[in-house]
């Protein structure tokens, strides 16, 4: 129980010379204690990051095994993710072991997800980022199979996302894949993701459509609605905010890549619509 804010607040308030000052100081101290309590509860720990790290690759391995046999493309997606996270040596070995565990027939999917949700303290931005990473595995061969979709339903259920929310995030993830492939010549699943520069020429009609979907909006939405959606997506995926909520340092580069794609989608839409 944190009371020092209340004690000090009341003391300095009393120095003002009356009971009202003390009460005001007590109230301010109470608000301070509450704020500090939230910060302590939400501060990411190494254990939280370990749980996130393991769950990411274990669940990815489980999705890869959903069709019965792990394909070369699915292995490549996992390997490319490790490359983007700059994993080497012991860290890479841990990621590979987690991926292998996820492929086992008796892998405890729901228990792993429940542990991850507890470790992340139910923070929606972190849970959504995790789900978006898993969608990369599901889209490894360019489409989501029925068995993979069934696993995604379980993931969404355990993380607290409705089917409607999952469908929306799934559509945005597919748009992200198409957006990148059209901008870079189809390299998304082949690992040409990190550090890419977007082409400067005007976007095609298809690229513009993907840009709208990546922001979760449609062409019929108003400029203000699109601008609001852009800012919301940037806030959700801001690397520093995600790190403060428990995102492992190794995944910071992925968060940066996501914000770059959101930024580019907005720039293309803004230019096409003449938004200032």
Q: Model-predicted segments: where are they?
A:
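Catalytic "initiation/cleavage/transfer" segments centered on a nucleophilic residue
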Residues: 67
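Small-residue-enriched hydrophobic alpha-helices in membranes
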Residues: 1-62, 72-237, 243-276
């Amino acid at each position: 129980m944190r009371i020092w804010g209340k004690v000090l607040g009341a003391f300095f308030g009393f120095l003002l010379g009356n009971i009202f000052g003390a009460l005001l100081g007590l109230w301010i101290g109470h608000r301070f204690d509450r704020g500090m309590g939230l910060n302590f509860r939400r501060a990411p720990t190494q254990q939280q990051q370990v749980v996130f790290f393991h769950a990411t690759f274990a669940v990815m391995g489980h999705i890869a095994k959903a069709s019965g046999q792990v394909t070369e493309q699915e292995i490549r997606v996992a390997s490319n993710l490790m490359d983007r996270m700059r994993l080497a040596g012991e860290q890479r070995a841990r990621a590979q072991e987690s991926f292998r565990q996820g492929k086992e027939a008796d892998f405890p999917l729901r228990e792993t997800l429940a542990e991850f949700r507890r470790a992340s303290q139910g923070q929606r931005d972190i849970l959504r980022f995790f789900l978006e990473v898993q969608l990369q595995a599901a889209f490894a061969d360019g489409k989501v199979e029925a068995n993979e979709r069934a696993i995604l339903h379980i993931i969404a259920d355990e993380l607290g996302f409705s089917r409607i929310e999952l469908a929306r995030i799934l559509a945005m993830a597919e748009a992200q894949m198409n957006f990148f492939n059209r901008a870079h010549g189809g390299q998304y699943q082949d690992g040409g993701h990190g550090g890419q520069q977007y082409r400067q020429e005007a976007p095609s009609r298809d690229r513009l459509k993907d840009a709208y979907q990546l922001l979760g909006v449609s062409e019929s939405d108003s400029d203000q609605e699109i601008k609001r959606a852009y800012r919301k997506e940037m806030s959700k995926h801001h690397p520093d905010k995600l790190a403060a909520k428990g995102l492992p340092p190794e995944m910071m580069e992925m968060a940066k890549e996501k914000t770059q794609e959101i930024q580019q989608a907005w720039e293309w839409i803004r230019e096409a619509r003449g938004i200032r």
